[in-house]
Amino acid sequence: MDEQVIFTTNTSGTIASVHSFEQINLRQCSTQSRNSCVQVGNKYLFIAQAQKALINVYNLSGSFKRESVEQRLPLPEILKCLEVVENNGVQYDRIQGVNHNLPDFNLPYLLLGSTESGKLYIWELNSGILLNVKPMAHYQSITKIKPILNGKYIITSGNDSRVIIWQTVDLVSASNDDPKPLCILHDHTLPVTDFQVSSSQGKFLSCTDTKLFTVSQDATIRCYDLSLIGSKKKQKANENDVSIGKTPVLLATFTTPYSIKSIVLDPADRACYIGTAEGCFSLNLFYKLKGNAIVNLLQSAGVNTVQKGRVFSLVQRNSLTGGENEDLDALYAMGQLVCENVLNSNVSCLEISMDGTLLLIGDTEGKVSIAEIYSKQIIRTIQTLTTSQDSVGEVTNLLTNPYRLERGNLLLEGESKGKQASNNNGHNFMKIPNLQRVIFDGKNKGHLHDIWYQIGEPEAETDPNLALPLNDFNAYLEQVKTQESIFSHIGKVSSNVKVIDNKIDATSSLDSNAAKDEEITELKTNIEALTHAYKELRDMHEKLYEEHQQMLDKQ
């Protein structure tokens, strides 16, 4: 198992390995906006091209991997951000009572893209249908799109200093021509550059401890508790106010001396790392005070308690007058937190490794530095292999994901063991459907459309006679009833009872037991004799060794 890093600059794209020196360049790759690159599973890479209404598709898996463009998808207009929504995290499908593995050609459910004017496009990838277009999702350009909770909600941020949370079902519903957001966060005063969501997620926002971290050019980090968002309430005809449920609670605000460009969270939500023009800094969310005291900076006050988020000011450790011996308790009482400087560079993008030990830092010079978080040392620097220009521009996209080492392939995921879909020329004939330009009319029930979907290989261990609730619910209930009756008749005590039919069997069993006792006594006698003989041999050996040692001393 290894990790690969994918990063793009203004004029190039590169795929490299974190722990080895394997590296390739992507051809005809040009991006100028952040978050314009998205990985579709372990197979495809979508990159929205700069100054072109086009998405370049690169194949990254198996024997079909190519450095050149695999497919081009025309767009209605130039897109700035891309994101995909997976199929609710389903690992396999159950079809006709048989479990099927993930197929080789496995596409996500939705593809989302945004424009410079704040317009939001939603496509269904398996058919290419344009489900909906939100003309004014943001007043200005959208900077990032991210789905959470297996695609139930979608979060967007923009240059209009707003962060908006949408319900996916509202965006794709045919009956909802103008979808409304679930809630809007407008605490920032300048464009929101990046945001991250904590790893503690569940099926619903109300029963999770999901936290949202947003950063902006106003030099602030804001943390919200998303678990208090309720369902939307319909507006009544005679009421002027519209209630959309409880808004997220602002837990804390962190101010910095510099404008923030990027943020990344530790996989265990222990710390956050921010990138600025003056360097990369780390902040422990479980802040250690003097001695053994530890403070949770994001402690929530509860559902029924009105809490006003605290405001903290971040201070570099090397800028303190007292150095390492500075009184952390006094600084914390004044609302100041000491943060560590990881790297001094003009940071544009940040990512973290799967185990949280390595930090990947993309700068404005087109380089990606891999730094060890504990020692704050640069382990490796990755650059574009070949270029004829003096500068390739800043790093616009930075992605990391784990991959398998298979058949000596040290860079991209090896060819799967199942059947490969290929033609005589050795190219993959499974193509992604073209993205439509006209919104699909879902109200027309007689209008049919095609969906491109491949079914994976069936699992060998699956019992074909197994009844599933989606296929035959009555048979499934009968099967559960049978299993329950079997368990109800089984007692808690398991014992073996020997039944003696007559006296002859009893006498023979007694004779066999007596013979076994005699054999055991004889074996014990033999063991005692062998032990006594071994002791005599050991004494003789010790005496001979002493005599031999005395003879050597005389010589």
Swiss-Prot record:
Q: Which family does it belong to?
A: Belongs to the WD repeat IPI3/WDR18 family.
What is known about its subunit structure? Component of the RIX1 complex, composed of IPI1, RIX1/IPI2 and IPI3 in a 1:2:2 stoichiometry. The complex interacts (via RIX1) with MDN1 (via its hexameric AAA ATPase ring) and the pre-60S ribosome particles.
Report which gene this protein is encoded by: IPI3
Q: Name one Pfam family in it.
A: WD40
Give all cystine bridges in this chain: none
Q: Which UniProt keywords apply?
A: Nucleus, Phosphoprotein, Repeat, Ribosome biogenesis, rRNA processing, WD repeat
Instruction: Say which species the protein is native to.
Output: Saccharomyces cerevisiae (strain YJM789)
Q: Name one GO biological process term.
A: rRNA processing
Q: Does Cytoplasm count among this protein's keywords?
A: no
Matching entries from SMART domains are given as: WD40
According to UniProt, the name of this protein is Pre-rRNA-processing protein IPI3
Write out the GO cellular component annotations: nuclear pre-replicative complex; rixosome complex
Q: Where in the cell is it found?
A: Nucleus
The chain residues annotated with the modification Phosphoserine are: 388
Q: Does the keyword rRNA processing apply?
A: yes
Q: What is its main location?
A: nucleus
Where does each WD repeat begin and end?
90-133, 137-176, 187-234, 342-383
Q: Which ranges form a coiled coil?
A: none
- Explain the purpose of this protein: Component of the RIX1 complex required for processing of ITS2 sequences from 35S pre-rRNA.
Q: Which InterPro entries match?
A: WD40/YVTN_repeat-like_dom_sf, WD40_repeat_dom_sf, WD40_rpt, WDR18/Ipi3/RID3
